[in-house]
Amino acid sequence: MASLHDLWFILVAVLFVGFFFLEGFDFGVGMATRFLGHNELERRVLINTIGPFWDANEVWLLTGAGAIFAAFPNWYATMLSGYYIPFVIVLLALMGRGVAFEFRGKVDHLKWVKVWDWVVFFGSLIPPFVLGVLFTTLFRGMPIDADMNIHAHVSDYINVYSILGGVTVTLLCFQHGLMFITLRTIGDLQNRARKMAQKIMGVVFVAVLAFAALSAYQTDMFTRRGEITIPLAVLIVICFMLAAVFIRKKKDGWTFGMTGAGLALTVGMIFISLFPRVMVSSLHSAYDLTVANASSGDYSLKVMSIAALTLLPFVIGSQIWSYYVFRKRVSHKEPMTY
């Protein structure tokens, strides 16, 4: 029978899977503004496709971080101290992007609009890349000592494997965002988004395969829990193969579902390969942080479980409702907030 700290690890995993699925297409749309939007009006249409959703989608990241803080304080302390600068970079990028969303539609000066457009682009590019780097180093292993402190060098953060992880996550988000655009726009903009998604499909596929191959060499992803992770890896490949088929048939909804499933399964596979560890020590396996030695006490976990079970359905329900209310496609002929 699963213990409370096991269940909270699963909850944290679900929150981050949800974050990358939902915020992933937000990031992708933000990146697409520089490549797909040919003028200010088209970029405005693109931003308004995610206008009603982006702030609620970010809540999944905040909730995930909050769950780690409450349920696994040692994990939170070790990770935040060891990854302090990268997390600050991510937060600054997210804050800048949020400010840009709000301000670009409220200024008439073209130069300022261009400035905010670049902030939207980099604020959408930096977080998935940095988070991809961090996740790969998380299960590749960091020099964590017996006191749960990280003593890392630059090469522990920046190496071929971590950069490939960052690039792969960024490409997955970009493609996911392009498919979201096809569901939320009409006409020429929709067609260009579909064509661009089709063009980069091969690049994304190669990146995913390269990441899987290097993961097999650099980590124990496919040996520790191979009976689960290997079928998941095959399923991820199938998702992207189906996405390639659906996009040729212009079945945008199915393609979006497949790209989202591939992204979500990739994140889920990382958490499965970690369990019961939460951070891997490259110094000695005895120094690994696990769900047992990094978690809060049983009483705290019980109280938080009751609160989570009570509130989570309302949060998920309200977000589903918002997607239903704002399901209409965005056009330059419609009033736009951003």
UniProtKB/Swiss-Prot annotation:
Cofactor mode of binding and number, as noted: Binds 1 protoheme IX center (heme b595) per heterodimer, in conjunction with CydA. Binds 1 iron-chlorin (heme d or cytochrome d) per heterodimer, in conjunction with CydA.
GO BP, one annotated term = aerobic electron transport chain
Write the record's keywords in alphabetical order, separated by commas.
Cell membrane, Electron transport, Heme, Iron, Membrane, Metal-binding, Oxidoreductase, Translocase, Transmembrane, Transmembrane helix, Transport
Q: Which InterPro entries does the record match to this protein?
A: Cyt-d_oxidase_su2
The record's subunit annotation is:
Heterodimer of subunits I and II.
Q: Which cofactor does it need?
A: heme b; heme d cis-diol
Q: Which GO terms describe its cellular component?
A: cytochrome complex; plasma membrane
The record, for PANTHER family, names: CYTOCHROME BD-I UBIQUINOL OXIDASE SUBUNIT 2, CYTOCHROME BD2 SUBUNIT II
> Looking at the Swiss-Prot or TrEMBL record, what is one Pfam family this protein matches?
Cyt_bd_oxida_II
Q: Does the keyword Oxidoreductase apply?
A: yes
State the protein's name. Answer: Cytochrome bd ubiquinol oxidase subunit 2
Q: Which reaction does it catalyse?
A: 2 a ubiquinol + O2(in) + 4 H(+)(in) = 2 a ubiquinone + 2 H2O(in) + 4 H(+)(out)
Tell me how this protein sits in the membrane: Multi-pass membrane protein
User: What's an example of a GO molecular-function annotation for this chain?
Assistant: electron transfer activity
Q: What class of enzyme is it?
A: translocase
**Membrane spanning stretches:** 7-27, 50-70, 75-95, 119-139, 163-183, 196-216, 227-247, 256-276, 306-326
Cellular localization per UniProt: Cell membrane
Q: Supply the EC number(s).
A: 7.1.1.7
Which family does the record assign? Answer: Belongs to the cytochrome ubiquinol oxidase subunit 2 family.
Main location per the UniProt record: membrane
What NCBIfam families does its record include? cydB
Q: Does the keyword Nucleotidyltransferase apply?
A: no
